[in-house]
Every structure is written in C-alpha cells, then in structure tokens.
C-alpha cells in the first residue's frame, strides 16, 4: 500500500481526504465563477496572510515566544512552501488578467505566454526540491535526511529520475498562443492541455509530493491533484490549468496557516517509506532505522516513462 491507512485512525484519514477534496472543489468554484471571488481568494487573502507571515518572522527574529512557537514558523519554514504559495498565487492573478482582459496585459497577445512561463516556474521549483533531496541524502542508493521542518525524508535516485520527469513535462506543454476566455468569463481555457498531458503532470507531481512531502502527500498529492482534474472532466473542459492553480494556491494558504491538520492530528497520514515506524518514525527525534522505498522507485519510473 502506498499510504499507511489502517487501524483506529483509518476512518478519520479517509474522512479528512474527502473533506479536503470537496473543500477544494467548492473553493475553486467560488474563485472561478466571479471577479469578487477571485479577488478575495487571490488578492485580498494572500495580502492579509503576507502581513501575518512577516509579523511571525519579525517576532521570531526578536525572540518572541509566540512567534518562535507558532505552528507556521515551526512546521512550514522551508523555502519550498513559500515559493510554491506565491508562485501559484501569481499564476492565479495572471490567469484572471487573461480571463477578464484586465488592462493592456489582459488584451495583449504576448501575455498568453504567461501561463506557460508560470507553470514552468512552478515545475522547476519542485524539480529543484527533488534534486536537493537527492543531494542531501548523501547517496543515490538512498539515505535519510532531516528537513528544516523536522520530517525525515528518504532521498535517492528516485528523486533524480522524478526531477528529470518534471523537466520533460515542461517541454510537453504546447499551444499557449491558443489560450482564450470562455464566453461567460468564468474560465481561462487552454485547449492543448488535453488528458494525456494532465495524466503525465499528475503522476509526476504526485510523485514529487510522495518523495518530498511524505506527511502531506495523502492530501497535497492525491486530493489536491484530483480536485482540479475532476472539475475539468465534468463541467469546465479546457480549464484544468486554471483549476490547478486555484486549488494549489488555496491549499498552500490553508496548509501554511494550519499545518497540524497534516502533521499532528487524527487526520495525519504518511507514506509507506517509514515501514512499521509510521508517523513516529517520520517525525521522530532520531533517524528511522527502517526504510521501504520500493513504492518510491516504482512511481518514479512510471513518472519518467509517461513524460517520455
């Protein structure tokens, strides 16, 4: 099994997944259906959170206990989380500019390249993180290393292979000059984002989370990837990349403020790499003594293969 879902917490883990999936689908609809929803989600909310994050780090620099013990500061302090949050939010804002034809940018044919650029940047952020894990592991054969957030990661050749798959995925994007707004202005449509590309992207990105966010992947890997795909398949065909950006940005905001939902609650779910050690091994004070990377290797091979 890819995830450790069993015992007394299994019901809560499944419930948590359903809540995250449904919540992301609903929030995406709020953000995409009106200007007010989009502005609230991707301009007002990120601005307020930025003030909150700055206050935390200023407080921590001054030695304030409330800041040093803040969940965001303790559990979500890596460069990756902030880079992903703001890159995804930038994508959402850019997509709204195109969708609503705001200003000269929104009416410019040249700005249609923006979605390709911002998606490529988001992919490269993850690729850099994958390569970092391979280096920090100390051996391509596999090795444990402790992240800045206190989670043990098992890096190795699977990170390198998945990183290469991410680079290939960038070159799989085509047709951005054909991007246009739907007649009702609810969606920015990228017709060339067909199911073949979505499948390749989803497998690659799921593997990224599986390798590098093993305490979050059940939610940010599985639920977060299926929510935009579900919506695009059923009611806003061609709008997958917009759905993906919206749900990613919203999830990053939630996870940054409420990290214990994934890290230390009855909903916490970890991958199979920790073996019998489970959650205790993932966030323990000492290096895990068991590693089961079989699933990591298999998914990386699949990720590379589908992107080739």
Kindly give the residue locations of the regions a language model identified.
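Membrane-interfacial helical/loop segments at transmembrane boundaries in membrane proteins
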Residues: 1-2, 62-76, 132-154, 265-292
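An N-terminal, globular interaction/scaffold subdomain
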Residues: 1-102
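C-terminal transmembrane-bundle signature of multipass membrane proteins
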Residues: 14-26, 220-308
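Hydrophobic cores of alpha-helical transmembrane segments in multi-pass inner/ER membrane proteins
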Residues: 15-25, 82-100, 161-176, 223-229, ...
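Hydrophobic alpha-helical transmembrane segments and adjacent interfacial helices
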Residues: 44-65, 93-101, 116-133, 195-211, ...
């Amino acid at each position: 099994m890819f995830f450790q879902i069993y015992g007394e917490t299994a019901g809560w883990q499944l419930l948590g997944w359903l809540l995250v999936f449904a919540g992301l689908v609903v929030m995406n609809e709020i953000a995409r259906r009106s200007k007010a929803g989009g502005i609230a989600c991707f301009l007002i909310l990120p601005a307020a959170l930025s003030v909150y994050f700055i206050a935390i780090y200023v407080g921590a620099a001054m030695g304030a206990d409330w800041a040093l013990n803040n969940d965001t500061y303790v559990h979500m302090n890596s460069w990756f989380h902030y880079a992903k949050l703001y890159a995804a939010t930038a994508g959402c804002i850019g997509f709204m500019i195109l969708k609503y034809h705001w200003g000269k940018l929104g009416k410019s044919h040249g700005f249609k390249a923006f979605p390709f650029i911002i998606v490529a940047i988001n992919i490269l952020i993850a690729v850099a993180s994958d390569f970092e894990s391979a280096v920090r592991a100390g051996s391509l054969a596999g090795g444990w290393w402790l992240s800045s957030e206190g989670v043990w990661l098992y890096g190795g050749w699977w990170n390198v292979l998945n990183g290469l798959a991410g680079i290939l995925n960038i070159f799989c994007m085509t047709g951005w000059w054909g991007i246009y707004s739907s007649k009702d202005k609810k969606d920015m449509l990228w017709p060339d984002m067909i199911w073949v590309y979505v499948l390749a992207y989803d497998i690659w990105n799921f593997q990224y989370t599986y390798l590098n966010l093993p305490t979050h992947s059940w939610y940010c890997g599985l639920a977060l990837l299926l929510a935009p795909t579900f919506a695009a398949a059923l009611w806003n065909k061609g709008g997958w990349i917009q759905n993906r950006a919206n749900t990613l940005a919203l999830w990053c905001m939630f996870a940054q403020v409420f990290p214990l939902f994934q890290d230390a609650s009855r909903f916490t779910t970890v991958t199979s790499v920790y073996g019998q050690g489970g959650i205790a091994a993932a966030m323990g004070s000492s290096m895990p003594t068991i590693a089961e990377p079989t699933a990591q290797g298999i998914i990386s091979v699949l990720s590379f293969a589908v992107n080739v």
